[in-house]
Amino acid sequence: MRRLTLLVNADDTLWESNVFFEHTLERFFSLVEPFGYARAYARHILNETERQNIQQHGYGVRSFARSLEQSYMKLAGGLAQRSAIEEVASMVAELEHTPPRVLDGVPETLAYLSSRHRMILFTKGEQAEEAAKVERSGLQGFFDSIEIVSDKSIRVYQGLIDKHHVVKTQGWLIGSSAQYDINPALQTGLNAAFVPHALTWSKENAELQSGAGKLLIVSSFRGLRDHF
């Protein structure tokens, strides 16, 4: 088989990510419930706050923490309590120190793929935070290179292609996000393998779009062995 270049996303592709954020959100919504707002409204306030913070501060737990604290203050108003703010900080600290839960079939599939192809881990987020997750996952040895970026735009994809001299027809992006993995990869001319995750972050969802590259959809990461 021809040796390909596989760009592999991390969060919700190699290990669980969003499920831990959702668990923290459930605790947060319970915290603000006494203020009488509908949960949908509280989530709307949080989503808007988070959107603004992502634009200013990027992705990651620290940006998420800022959004939770600011949303709490907006919802609590004059009823805000220092103990509640400390509880939010405690939630975030617990989230930050939660070790990656590697998804079923990932280690053996990476071992198989890395014996046949060039492997690049390609993930977005806060640099130190993502690097720590990669190290704690124990998966770094399967990759020839690790790329951590603040966002996954078409420009960033093209820069990665140029940096690693990827022949587009022989390059594949493997990921769980249509918005940040699959669509921009296809639009830059790469091929893409979509591995959907049941609990992908809502901001990651989008309609799959066509592009110059091929699109493959597999039901699990383990299923990649049937195609590569």
Regions found by a protein language model. Name each.
Residues M1-I45:
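Active-site neighborhood of HAD-like aspartate-dependent phosphohydrolases
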Residues M1-L4, P107, A111, R118, ...:
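Asp-based, Mg2+/Mn2+-dependent phosphohydrolase catalytic module
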Residues F21-F29, A65, E69, Q127:
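An amphipathic alpha-helix signature
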Residues E33-E48, G77-V88, F142, T169:
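Short, surface-exposed acidic
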Residues N47-E94:
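A metal-dependent, Asp-based hydrolase signature
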Residues E87-P107:
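Long amphipathic N-terminal alpha/beta scaffold segment
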Residues T123-G125:
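Conserved phosphate-coupling serine/threonine residues in phosphotransfer and NTP-handling enzymes
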